[in-house]
Amino acid sequence: MNESALNPNYLFHPFVKRFPGDPEHVRNISDIQQLEKYPISERFPCQTVTDALFIAAKKYQHARAMSYLPNGRADDVLQSWSYLEFLEQCIGAANLFHSLGIESDHSVAFLLPNMPEMVFGLWGAQAVAISTPINPFLAVNHICGIVTETKTTILVTLSPDTNPSLFEKALAVKHNTTHTMTLVTIGTPCEDAIDWHTELKKQPFNRYLFNRQLTGMETSAYFHTGGTTGTPKIARHTHRGAMINACQMLIVGPTETELDTKSKVSLCALPLFHVNAIVVSSLTSLLNGSELLLAGQQGFRNKALMSDFWRIVERFKVNFFAGVPTVYAALLEQPVEQHNIDSLFYCGCGSSPMPQVLIKEFTQRTGADICEGYGMTETTACASTHYYYGDRKVGSVGMRVPYQHIRAVHLDDNGQIIKECDCDEVGVLLIQGPNVIPEYKQAFANEQAWPEPGWLNTGDLGKFDADGYLWLTGRQKDLIIRGGHNIDPLIIENTLVSHSDVVMAAAVGKPDAYAGELPVAYVTLTSGATLSADELKQYCKDYISEPAASPVEIYITAELPMTPIGKIFKLPLKHDVIVRFVRELIQALDDTLDFSIDIIDDVSTGNIVSINFAATREKMEAVASQLQQELDKLHFQWKCTFTPVLAEQTVLES
């Protein structure tokens, strides 16, 4: 442990160090540049999460590190661990894995819901080997691919009496992989696996049974990415990358002095197989001495948690939680005003763009600030965010975190850089920094991922304004993001073309005010086929393992747009589904209106949906406010031109 834990020159000491000339509060890019005058090795000295847990235990000792609501209800009997007890559980888990013979270059995979054992296990595994959290909803073949690629020799899951389907899935994974893998279960002991709690009791909790000298650049974890419903890419995380990213967020957030005046309780209800929950919610909480409140096994998927959420905030004085746009929209359907939630002052949002009207309504009704950020598995977690003491530009995703850089560029068809984008010019986003992963585990995933050494091609589109704020405008890649749930269109397309009557298929995202996007598909059929769209939708439900990926609409068409070299050209389909959506929206408001819809491609702002109406003034005034209210919920630029009869042309736009 580092004695600098007692040094007053450290902010969140000893994780973030202060130097002469540092700004008191980080407000803008100039402040970031001032911080960057000192080397990152001096600014963020701690090298590994394993070291950080020891340092935090020494500093915070008997303060609560983590609490658990087993059912995600406000009246649950709380289970709690102090910082010292938290460290002991992580040490015990590491010793358990060591006793099962794991090697340092092997991994422990976790097929679990959100529960304390997963947190202890993840960081215990990183002390002795590598941790690999896996989405329990993935299909068996995808999980088999992950555990094979990551050299998983221990798989932790729930016992058959606790969750029969999850245990059967884990058993199927074990039987369908060629290498030896030990199954460890949590719950009632069973014959087919080693029992977690029985073996844990045999381990010492005050020392490691192994001698491993960790360095910051060693692999700490493998996180799968690229969509929960397609072939997952595996990102290699390092110990140093995790520590740096957590510290990057701490230094642009509220100061330790300000946090000490709050209740310091961070609620976590996002899935622990995702970097947001592990790094943004959990690791930063432990580094700043907060209490991590784990809100039930299913997190935000649990309807009981959603209905009880504001009671939980009130009872436990929660001051921070992170969510996705669909979560925030659902929480506003609950009665907020009848609860005292003054403790809540800071919320995080990522995964997909959040409608501005939703941000404003949430802040107005709760008094809490939503901090929109941008990041991905490949940046460990966070790449840009709104600084706590900086100005808010609602609709942007803030500014870059320190010691990391983001560029907007134009790329050619081979993924090579053509030019740097000007201010307010849309381009593909590239990211470089110490929090960016060194590589994907699979060779195929690294192809065209790095246009320049160290610079990751995110596949996202965005622009920077004159103040350095980043504005996302779309995605170069074709992932469909449904309520923060990444859907690879290829899995939909492959399923559809597996039908004997389907020739070609293309899946795209349809705008949705609640989920952001919903998957839809366009298909062409064989000559003479009489297959209906409803039959194809049922076919997808039968063969796509993740329900969220099943298309909500299927459009049967005579042909699909193609590029000159014979590839399906999706841009016209993306435009078509937007036009269909807006047309349905307008007709639902007034089916007698005369209008036209066009998609305008603008290099500086991205696509603009242009709607032109020819109507009487009475009809125009009747529909204008309703239409604006509905369009403002969506995350695309729009422009409505109303041409009233016998009146001047008027314009309404976002």
From Swiss-Prot:
Keyword hit for Nucleotide-binding: yes
InterPro entries xrefs: AMP-bd_C (IPR025110), AMP-bd_C_sf (IPR045851), AMP-binding_CS (IPR020845), AMP-dep_synth/lig_dom (IPR000873), ANL_N_sf (IPR042099), ATP-dep_AMP-bd_enzyme (IPR050237)
PROSITE patterns in alphabetical order: AMP_BINDING
BP terms from Gene Ontology: antibiotic biosynthetic process
GO molecular function term, any single one: acid-thiol ligase activity
Keywords per UniProt: Antibiotic biosynthesis, ATP-binding, Ligase, Nucleotide-binding, Plasmid
Role this protein plays: Acyl-CoA ligase that catalyzes the CoA acylation of pseudomonate C, leading to the formation of pseudomonoyl-CoA C (PAC-CoA). Also shows high activity with pseudomonoyl-CoA A as substrate. In addition, can activate acetic, octanoic, 2,4-dodecadienoic and 2,4-decadienoic acids, although with much lower activity. In vivo, is probably involved in the biosynthesis of thiomarinol, a naturally occurring double-headed antibiotic.
Similarity comment text for this entry: Belongs to the ATP-dependent AMP-binding enzyme family.
Name of this chain's protein: Marinolic acid--CoA ligase
Upper lineage: Bacteria, Pseudomonadati, Pseudomonadota, Gammaproteobacteria, Alteromonadales
